[in-house]
């Protein structure tokens, strides 16, 4: 009798009205459930409709979190979280008008324009990051593009070679790049190139006017064609609607190949920028973005990025459960505050997380082939 009762109870779930529903009826209420099951069964796909992604995004939050976790555990080691460090190697003085950015020369934010950091300073920072547990070192320069920056670009190529030689993944975000520059970055050993789309195509002109959405997509195409991993995500909290968040995810999920890395940033409003009065992003908004990204781009590294400093350890744990498997660690993310190494080590210990080792998918023959292409195109 006890066994019968147990089985009977396991097949029934409470409904919103207080009655009982069968488990199959309950699960059919959620698009997250259906799409997660399909993703697990069929693997990644690039033909998502905007309505499909909206249905996943709009699923009940706890259901979305649960099914994001299902997909995450199916594709990844759910305890592994990669630690990355992002260093601003050329700070301030940017000519663009990105309304969230304290490095724009158009705003009075207290950020002073600086020259490119020396090789010794950059390598020292990379060594400290590695000692603290980071396996990916990212270098950011406050530039619109790399045109006319031949000397600085050549220096950065040397930085990449040396840091890659330390056994770390290397990522750069240097603004827009051309095909030839992408090939040279590949030849130097660059693992990934970051170029965020920031928001939906529709909302984008409200955030930036000095670089078009298609400019960003063109850079991603150059990166992909060069054989470099694509790192591209966005920022929430810019004043956009939920439809714009869905639009961002739809654009990323329908690229010819999904980005290997999808950073989800929560705006940290900086005084002096046009968005200084934006209200802080709530953790539930982050969870919804992360869970949806995990279901529609199952193999991507979903990176819990800027704004993490505002979330408690408990809140971050929910993000990892929903599908995030990477963080940026260190005192600063470019010029904004971030969680320091010690705090993150404590979090890893408390949550039972395991540092993800570096991953080098490119073999030597690929690098050699790319080197030949780069040489031939000079």
From Swiss-Prot:
Family annotation (SUPFAM superfamilies): Radical SAM enzymes (SSF102114)
Listed pathway(s): Cofactor biosynthesis; biotin biosynthesis; biotin from 7,8-diaminononanoate: step 2/2
Domain of life: Eukaryota
Family listed: Belongs to the radical SAM superfamily. Biotin synthase family.
Pfam families documented for this protein: BATS (PF06968), Radical_SAM (PF04055)
Protein name as annotated: Biotin synthase, mitochondrial
Reactions mediated catalytically: (4R,5S)-dethiobiotin + (sulfur carrier)-SH + 2 reduced [2Fe-2S]-[ferredoxin] + 2 S-adenosyl-L-methionine = (sulfur carrier)-H + biotin + 2 5'-deoxyadenosine + 2 L-methionine + 2 oxidized [2Fe-2S]-[ferredoxin]
GO molecular function: 2 iron, 2 sulfur cluster binding; 4 iron, 4 sulfur cluster binding; biotin synthase activity; zinc ion binding
Binding site for [2Fe-2S] cluster: 138, 171, 231, 303
Chain positions covered by the region annotation Disordered: 357-378
Gene from which this protein is expressed: BIO2
PROSITE patterns for this protein: RADICAL_SAM
Protein location: Mitochondrion
GO cellular component terms given for this protein: mitochondrion
GO biological process entries: biotin biosynthetic process
Cofactor(s) recorded in Swiss-Prot or TrEMBL: [4Fe-4S] cluster; [2Fe-2S] cluster
Cofactor descriptive note: Binds 1 [4Fe-4S] cluster. The cluster is coordinated with 3 cysteines and an exchangeable S-adenosyl-L-methionine.
Residue intervals of the Radical SAM core domain: 79-308
EC number, UniProt record: 2.8.1.6
InterPro entries cross-referenced by the UniProt entry: Aldolase_TIM (IPR013785), BATS_dom (IPR010722), Biotin_synth/BioAB (IPR002684), Biotin_synthase (IPR024177), Elp3/MiaA/NifB-like_rSAM (IPR006638), rSAM (IPR007197)
Transit peptide, from-to: 1-26
UniProt main location, coarse: mitochondrion
Keyword terms of this UniProt record: 2Fe-2S, 4Fe-4S, Biotin biosynthesis, Iron, Iron-sulfur, Metal-binding, Mitochondrion, S-adenosyl-L-methionine, Transferase, Transit peptide
